[in-house]
Amino acid sequence: MPPKREFLEVRGAAEHNLKKVSVRLPKHQLVVFTGPSGSGKSSLAFDTIYAEGQRRYVESLSAYARQFLGQMEKPRYDHIRGLSPTISIEQKAASNNPRSTVGTITEVADYLRVLWARIGRQHCHQCGAPVERLSAAEIVDRLAALPAGTRFLLLARLVDNRKGEHQGLIDEALGAGFARFRIDGQVVAQDELPVLDKKRKHTIDVVIDRLAIGVDGAFPRARVTDSVETGLRRGNGRLWCQIVGGDERLFSEALWCHACDQGFPEPTPQSFSFNSPLGMCADCNGLGTKPEMDPALVVPDPTKTVRGGAIEPWANVMKADSWTGGIIAKVAAEFGIDLDRPWSELPARHRDLLLHGSRGRKIAMTMKFASGKLEWQRSFEGVLNELYRRFRQTKSEGMRRWYMQYLSEARCSTCDGRRLRPESCAVTVGGRSLPEVSGLTIAEARDFVLGLRLGAAERQIATEVQKEIDARLGFLLNVGLGYLSLDRPGPSLSGGESQRIRLASQIGSELTGVLYVLDEPSIGLHQRDNDRLLATLRRLRDFGNTVLVVEHDRDTIEAADYVVDFGPGAGTAGGEVVHAGTVASLRRAASLTGRYLSGRLAIPTPARRRAGSGKTLRLEGAREHNLKDVSVDLPLGTLIAVTGVSGAGKSTLVNAVLRPALARALHGGQDVPGAHDALRGVEHVDKIIGIDQRPIGRTPRSNPATYTKVFDAVRDVFAMTTEARTFGYGPGRFSFNVKGGRCEACEGDGVRRIEMHFLADVFVPCEVCRGRRFNDATLRVRFKGLDVAEVLDLPVTQALEVFANQPRVLPGLRTLAEVGLGYLKLGQPSPTLSGGEAQRIKLARELSKPMTGRTVYVLDEPTTGLHFDDLRKLLHVLDRLVDAGNTVVVIEHHLDVIRCADHVVDLGPEGGDAGGRIVATGTPEEVARVAGSHTGRFLREALRQAKPAATPRAPRRPAPPPRAAVAAGHLG
């Protein structure tokens, strides 16, 4: 038997910028790869070790299976020994499918659906009364409970309010031995049967039996049982009991609301799925939202009059002598609407009439023509209804796009955003419907499920389901996601949240002997929750797995059993292992990471905080999601950090309320801002630029050079060469987006997409151009010995040397280098970029544009994927923006960014419903003094350990005296 390998050995790894790297990693340990951005960490972890694990797995499959998976390219290395089965957990969005939620991703929703289907209590969705189902024995017991001396009839319904004589049904019942009927409420004997009017509706019951309970309480159980069973058979599972001289009762073997006389289908797990026709709301098809015409987009400027174009789609018709304009004028005359009064000053009823129409009320219309006049009556449709009707009816793609500018997603009015049909929403467990429980946070949902008070039979059914739900929710809590709700849409999750959800799922699988490769699992996690994440990673290791983490977070590095530090620089200056060993030995190492960990290098804390321009942007009464009437002042001309534990409301405040509200006020943005009262101080700002982590493109044609417009200048340089002018080539010849210079086999992509049908599509290099994108004729043209394909293959740092004398190319390249992307290749396809890299490319593009000094920049966790030294460069870039008079708002957990900010807004105190308030605000020093702030607690220690800057920042105006941080509520 071969000896068991206790190490994973990699020799001669040369993928991307790796320089024949060799490492020996201990198995069953927590191993961290760290180093500057672009130094080769991911190239070894993902593109070599994980990729080879996947390739070997595919090679182990049958030839039949491999034909569907295609040939996976072998990474460049000499040999790898001791490789375990590999599982990758990356920072990718969980799903772009709007039907995907936290509950469906984690499978918790599947177990909840089973729970509601098996022990849920059905209520009538119309009257709210409990809906019950009774067996024949239970019906007999109900009848036995009637008072002594009660006389009653048992009846089965033959006809329920239908036209006709129905003689055939009556004859069939007579033939079966029944002698009495109840016709339209009157009990008649066989010889008294009337002739029914076939043009009228009738209700006919057959009398199954006439029964009585003795004065002494004697109950003829055997006879009643036979009659009940007969009646249920005759009445298709329903039986009426008419108390003589009293009321009537309906018993049913199926679910039935007696008050509304309505049946309900038997609940199944599919009845509670918004992805199944059996459960989804019929109006929104289970999405919970519908596109509707948005009044705020239709009337973007309420200071205008109707005649002056307040209603934007009607702006032109109001100025001309048009048919629509004439109708609006007639409506205005009929209802006394002043078309020359500002929209905001019109009475609410007049605004409602113009938007939603006359709601069926007819208006006399008159139109005069040269040949006479036309008179008629019609109701007024209203602008919103008219636009939506035309949007649904048009066949023109151009008109559809025009109408879509006035559409926004609105909560479905039928299901109120709950996604399920009314009958499904009326089933409760523990007094709550499934949508109500799905709206709880993970922590609250777990408490609810475990706290259910169930009967013995229900407990027996639910115990195993409760265990599964408890386990899954527990794992999510352990990775710091307790603030998420189960109905949170998958597309709204950040890359870090998605990664931790997948991590929680792997904990639940309890696999052993696996190599897990993780990409920065600490992204988006507050310092307070780091310990729980590290405990989860250790638990994964303790199952007998090897956990390999690519990480920059100080706590994660210090918790590692073994650390591999890459460097010394990025791109071609990296690709080497500069240290491999324990954390203690790394602190003594001369590498960049070692010097930052030991404190020999540090990002200094500014000696003074910028006071800003003296003007503020004030957001009042923000109430979106979990925000609790938050009002906040943002000093303009400063670097503002918005902080708080995960789920405290940071992204909601900035991305869901502030950014869209400012965009709408400044640029007429179409995104609907979250609920708030007012945004003041907009006049001090001229632009809002959101720099998020969404991809810069979704195809291989999109890359850093094209996005930043650097490639436009590069193409001009190639077009000016002697060879290009000789061949008559212009800049378009060097574009891979148009015919001429590109390879037509792949249409300039450099790769061909292979559709895998039931798997993700696979991209393979083009066989004609071998991934170079251009045809041979184009590649004849060279600049400084390089063709255009070779230029696109250059890292930014090398491109700076090549184009050192090209003033049109240099600015874009410099900004890419300044934001820490010097290692990126100019033509690196956008699908291969991380969220953090995409965000910094967007930042670089904005930096290369002229600044006005009155712009608000919004960044969401810009430190994603940044090493300590790259973070220092990023802070320098942000300082440049602020020093030019702009305002930078960052949502951030990284303590180095927070302590370097001029102003901090800390939300909390916890996540979910326990958050949504401002806990502290002010300078980092002021926030650090607030006892109730989790951020302040960690910030105190960070400020204590940090070194002050040698050169203090100069405020643009005298700084105000320090004020006490506001501990709760909102700023006044």
Residue ranges and their predicted role:
Residues 1-972:
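Conserved phosphate-binding elements of NTP-dependent enzyme cores
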